[in-house]
Amino acid sequence: MRLRSILLVGVAMMCACAVVANPAIIPTPKSYIACEGEFKLLPSHYVATSSAMLMPLANYLAEHLSVEADTKGDIVLKLDTTLKSEEYRLRVMADRVEILGGDYGGVFNGVATFMQLLPADVYKNLALPATVACCEVEDAPKYKYRGFMLDVCRTWITKEAIMEYVDLLAYHKINKLRLHLTDDEAWRLEIKSHPELAMVGGFRGGDSPIWPRYGKWTEKWGGYYTQADMREIIAYAKVRNIEVIPEIDLPGHSLAMASMHPEILCNYTPNLDDTFGYDTRSAFCAAKESNYTLLRDIIREVCQVFDTKYIHIGGDEVETSQWKRCPDCLALMAKLGYTKPEQLQAYFMRRISDMLAEYGKQPAVWNEAIDGGKLPANTLVFGWMGVKECKLSAAKGYKTIVMPGQYFYFDMKQSKREPGHDWAAIFDWSKTYGVTLTSLGFSAEEQKNVVGFEASFFSEAYASRTPENADFLHYQTFPRMLSLAEIAWVSSNSRDKDAFYKQMIEHYARLDAMGIAYRLMPPKVIFENGVLSAQSDDGSTIYVQNVVTNVGEVYTKPITTTKPERYVFVARRGSASSPEAAVEGYFRTLKPQFTLTSSMPQHSTMTFAKAQEYGRLARTARTCDVGDWIQFTFAQAVDCRRMQIATGNFQLPRFIFEQGYAEVSYDGKTFVTVGDLQNGMYVLDNPPHPIKAVRLVCSSQGNGAKYVSIQPPTIWPRL
């Protein structure tokens, strides 16, 4: 009779549960089984665990659920040694919830999934009672390293902002945060044995020896993390199953350090005439023993602060040409039998790796660091330059993080007219989502050495964003972060972009609740038979503006017009927004003939004629001084609705007139001042007359570089 009862219960359970498509959980779990009934979360419920290790996690979940944590309760967190690391089992029953994990990370992953089953307000202020459909979830990640790198050097990002971003990563099961703490622009971590590194090196501009870059040209600006700050970030992230990995970028990208300690540089005197005495060298001399003494102090303190296994020591974009001019480096190369400076870099990295080993740490490096010779076998290599470099690292036997820029650099543009870089690629979420190691050409043996994926956000273009774009970090990284989370978690050699897009749209309500100012896909704009319309499929509201009358409103119905180019559309929902969408005529630009002249001599190869051809940069042969000017004179006066005249690179404000003003001439003879430059450029909106010439005048000495870049003008016609 007892056996019959057990069988009946088993049949009932099988009838009560069924495998169905998961309810838009990102990343997608291995198995989601829907069951009959629901769990009703009440204020009287408790998150419970008997494990001291899991109590911080119980408190974390209880805070999100608006309940208390205790050793007994209705939502139970447990360790299960039969499960692997980060593996979990989640059971939602009518009377209780059980989350079991193979370790702390596994239980956390179950908690993150459980939160995605609750109403979206769980991420801000969950109202009780709340219901969750009964279900069973079995899940584990494909890769143990699911990372994101945040550059806090080019743009200072506060401790509080980092911790807020940690939450966003944790909600999506990203488990590594690499902080890019040192670079040419700043030194962000307190080193108590050398306090000047952060106290001076954390700031640039003003009376700082570090030249201003990427914005904030006229003020001393920045900050740094005390060791107490960093320990607070580490502890906060640890509760959320995120390991914080520091990067101290060596031996290159060290201009900030060199600005404070020029003695670290190679033993030769460069020509500084073109930079008004500012030394732009950025690489540690590899031959000076005093440098290794300084770095030993730094490494010791970094290892004491961070509890991670790996310390990233850089190795990218080292200007080894400086070593070729250094008598000490050349002598060391001869002594060691080296013929290439890349071998000297490997020597440098091995010495730093030996220091790390003394403190029980292992080195992590950028892919260039393995080009010049063998590094320790336990080195973790981050392949950023391309797929080829990732495959080479794995083939050499190094554990490898796959992060080629054309798929994983989230500072890249998402379409050609949006802000960001474009040197690696222009891509949105779909390109990242499409990545599999098989599709990238990794062999079975190479795949064995891939331990995960990482995306990155280098922040050069962040500091100069205008106030209305203060959420640039969110916009650039979401929803691309959802793609990263998915491919780093799910074991699959095929991708269904349409299905995942539908998952993302369902997930947008959660991004809204998290307060993420993510990027929406632009509305689809159609003009047929004199009727202009716009469509969106993501639940957003579409807004339309007539750029001639400057009247904007919510788009509700198609527009009958003979001038479709006068209308521009954007989509918004919550804090999210899309790029502009319009018929192609709206984006059309003019390319009138012009002559470029300057008080500064032109570069020998990047001549002024390059800019006159449009689409290419010109350069001067020296940096700028007070009173220097650049003039654009048009063959015929240009009538337009907008004209942008800019110094600097196309994608970010570097090699610019840091301070200055613009003058306009309508007759080619008389110039009038129209305003100050912003980040090296001036934009003329609706000029009252056709423009014959524009002149940019510099009002500050130098720009931290050896030249000024000059862009061709961008000119929009009247509509």
Where are these regions (language model features)?
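Acidic, contiguous N-terminal accessory segments
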Residues: 19-141, 364-370, 509-513, 600-601
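Short beta-strand-plus-loop segments that form exposed binding edges in beta-rich domains
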Residues: 696-704
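Flexible, acidic glycine-rich loops studded with aromatic residues
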Residues: 363-368, 375-379, 385-533
